[in-house]
Amino acid sequence: MPESHVFNLKRDPVDRRDLMLGIGRMAVGTRPKSVDLRSALPAVWNQGDVGSCFAHAGAACQAHQVFKEGGGIITPSRLCLAVTTRHDEGTLHCDNGATLRGTVKAMARYGVPPETLWPYDVSKYFELPPPAVLAQAEKWQALRYYRIPVGRHAPELFRRALAAGFIVMFGAALYDSFESEEVAAAGRVPMPNTATEALLGGHAMAAVGYDADLLVRNSWGPEWGEGGYCRMPDAYFADPDLLWDAWVISLTEIGK
């Protein structure tokens, strides 16, 4: 039987306090025509049959930040991030998804330790890690997080962030065509026909590069798509009904 996927990411509610990563903050000279940050990341993970896409997207961003700081290629504890995020959103004891704002806040409040300290075991999806693990997590706290505005400028903002070396975690509305055999085989995502296709729900992924399209890391294992990755058109990211939310994390201030 085909693997069952969960689509229960929640859209961020409006919060005027969000620090925005707009055009001015991400001003660049001549950005490269293409960027590919996959070599700084471990093999694509598989979230399994729980709705932990938000934690997988956040862990990819954390892994890249650690690599940038000279820490090598690591796997952050996806389970720890999934649990702390849901704990703070009041949904630890159910699998009802989470928001990306809650994810970045948990990354800043608790940190995300290496997966060697708290492996990805979904039987522990509804319990907090022991205090010793949470104490170690504090060494890996995100110091900054910024929201990328959705809308027509989003594809360019994604590219500017990626050109500056920041992976972008994002939440999107997905439709039937995303689960098609064609996408699973080749990793090329079409624009959905929202008038005729069924809405699957919300899903978090991470943009890790671009050329003509944006290169996206999923969390359905390396057998799906292009080694676990897919390519999505700019039009998807420019549509605020499809792209819900987008964030970057950093260990330092971005811009001035």
Question: What are the roles of these predicted feature ranges?
Answer:
Residues P42, G70-G97:
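A contiguous, well-ordered beta/alpha segment that forms the leading edge of an enzyme domain
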Residues P13-V14:
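Basic/aromatic DNA-contact patch characteristic of tyrosine site-specific recombinases
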Residues P2-H5, K10, R31-K33, S39, ...:
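Predominantly the structural core of cysteine protease catalytic domains
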Residues D49-V50, F54-G58, C80, T99, ...:
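Catalytic-loop motifs flanking and including active-site residues across diverse enzymes
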Residues Q47-G71, A164, F170:
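Alpha-helical support elements that line or immediately flank enzyme active sites
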Residues L19-R31:
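Blade/loop signatures of beta-propeller domains
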